[in-house]
């Protein structure tokens, strides 16, 4: 029995990081088990984060597209939906993703163990199953890929039926007419787009002086303007003093003296690593104040046989990066060293309505570094494909070195921005002289396409040189 419960590697968590590690390890011939605390695989990415929020966004954007299409407006037709009704679309996508990922484990003969894991000593974990029974498993090595969860400050009553975090909002049963979103990071801005797109009065409380300050200033300003134009009320530089749940809603008392009232509140201000229930001291580890673990270049923790990947190690906290980290940790375990590493310029995709995506440096970063750069711009309203699709809001901006023509940064705001960015990323990742803005002038694009924005922006930028 003890032999059957011993593995070469046990991976704790079946999100993107855990999946990447497990697949790499099983394909290398190791005996691997994956422990998942929920009843199905996929982790927070599949069940509460990336997949459901993007499915919701897609449904809302299609409703907006229908209602703004002149073909339907002429017939006085209008399509309406509530948050609770479009949740059905998100759940169908979650089910498909879960079945797909379950198949990966089945085909690769990777054992799945459902339950909550905690360390009991350096090489042993105890897994508590849903029925309360416990089973003990041992392994030579461990990979912690437990992800993160929404941060919940102690002075906010998340048990109140009208106060939600970004996980529990997916269980919203009523249909609010007015919502306050506290926290204007990526998650807060994405949900602001979703609720406003459904016609819900939306107030967005930002604890900083501008939205998504890590973005290029022009893109951040474009998002702020688009929110303002669509009716989202943004309160910058505000912090709550207390959040009061009432019988019919929520009142937010701000430190500035203002008060805000709505049917419900979505608290979306920060996340914390899921390490508190692992009993890390038993294996010689300790998470930091945010529940995160420190790792080296091989994703090895301070304990030699324990590795960690994904949100639980902090930046960049992206599903795409977590999967790559999982692959790299599998290489580190099987070969002693990871063959690859995360690229320096990881693209950012923000699924607001419209989308935002960027890769490389911002204008403010290049200006601070005194880099002689130039800017090439393309407005979507001038692209035939955007006009045909009725998606003419947005632009593409290319930042490049005035002397070498090297592409330094790309920033996109508009329909399919998260897809469009990868064209430029592919050229940016080329070595030496192959990374040049002139590529977009000298190549031939399909017409009409959104990708043609690169040619327009490149010509615009090169024409600025003298």
Curated annotation (Swiss-Prot):
Record keywords: Cytoplasm, FAD, Flavoprotein, NAD, NADP, Oxidoreductase
Subcellular location: Cytoplasm
DNA-binding keyword on record: no
Pfam families recorded: Pyr_redox_2 (PF07992), Pyr_redox_dim (PF02852)
InterPro entries associated with the record: Class-I_Pyr_Nuc-Dis_Oxidored, FAD/NAD-bd_sf, FAD/NAD-binding_dom, FAD/NAD-linked_Rdtase_dimer_sf, Pyr_nuc-diS_OxRdtase, Pyr_nucl-diS_OxRdtase_dimer, STH_gammaproteobact
Cofactor note: Binds 1 FAD per subunit.
Protein name per its UniProtKB record: Soluble pyridine nucleotide transhydrogenase
Species name: Vibrio vulnificus (strain YJ016)
Lineage, uppermost ranks: Bacteria, Pseudomonadati, Pseudomonadota, Gammaproteobacteria, Vibrionales
Gene that produces this protein: sthA
């Amino acid at each position: 029995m003890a032999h059957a419960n011993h593995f070469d590697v046990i991976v704790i968590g079946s999100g993107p990081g855990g999946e990447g590690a497990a697949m790499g390890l099983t394909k290398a011939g190791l005996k691997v088990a994956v422990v998942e605390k929920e009843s199905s695989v996929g982790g927070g990415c599949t069940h509460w984060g990336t997949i459901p929020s993007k499915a919701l966004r897609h449904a809302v954007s299609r409703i907006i597209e229908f209602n703004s299409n002149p073909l339907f407006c002429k017939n006085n037709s209008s399509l309406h939906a509530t948050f609770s009704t479009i949740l059905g679309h998100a759940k169908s996508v979650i089910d498909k993703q879960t079945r797909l990922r379950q198949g990966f484990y089945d085909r690769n003969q990777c054992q799945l163990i459902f339950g909550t894991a905690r360390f009991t000593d350096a090489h042993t974990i105890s897994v508590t199953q849903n029925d309360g029974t416990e089973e003990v498993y041992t392994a030579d090595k461990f990979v912690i890929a437990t992800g993160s969860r929404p941060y919940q400050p102690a002075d906010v009553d998340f048990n109140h039926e009208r106060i939600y975090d970004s996980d529990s909002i997916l269980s919203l049963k009523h249909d609010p007419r007015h919502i306050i979103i506290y926290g204007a990071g990526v998650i807060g801005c994405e949900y602001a787009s979703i609720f406003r797109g459904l016609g819900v009065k939306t107030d967005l409380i930002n604890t900083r002086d501008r939205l998504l300050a890590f973005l290029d200033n022009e893109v951040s300003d474009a998002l702020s303007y688009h929110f303002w134009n669509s009716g989202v009320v943004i309160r910058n530089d505000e912090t709550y003093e207390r959040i009061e749940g009432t019988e019919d809603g929520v009142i937010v008392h701000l430190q500035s003296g203002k008060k805000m009232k709505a049917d419900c509140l979505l608290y979306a201000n920060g996340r914390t690593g899921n390490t508190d229930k692992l009993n890390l001291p038993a294996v010689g580890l300790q998470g930091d104040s945010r529940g995160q673990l420190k790792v080296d270049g091989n994703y090895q923790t301070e304990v030699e046989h324990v590795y960690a990947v994904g949100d639980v190690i902090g930046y960049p906290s992206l599903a795409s990066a977590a999967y790559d980290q999982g692959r790299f940790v599998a290489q580190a375990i099987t070969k002693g060293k990871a063959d690859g590493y995360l690229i320096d310029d990881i693209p950012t995709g923000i699924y607001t309505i419209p989308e935002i995506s960027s890769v490389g440096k911002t204008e403010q970063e290049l200006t601070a570094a005194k880099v002689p750069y130039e800017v090439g711009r393309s407005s979507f309203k001038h692209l035939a494909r955007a006009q045909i699709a009725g998606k003419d809001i947005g632009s593409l901006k290319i930042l490049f070195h005035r002397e070498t023509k090297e592409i330094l940064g790309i920033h996109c705001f508009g329909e399919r921005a998260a897809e469009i960015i990868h064209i430029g990323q592919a050229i940016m990742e080329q070595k030496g002289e192959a990374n040049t803005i002139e590529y977009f002038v000298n190549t031939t694009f399909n017409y009409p396409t959104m990708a043609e924005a690169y040619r327009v922006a490149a010509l615009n930028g090169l024409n600025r040189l003298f």
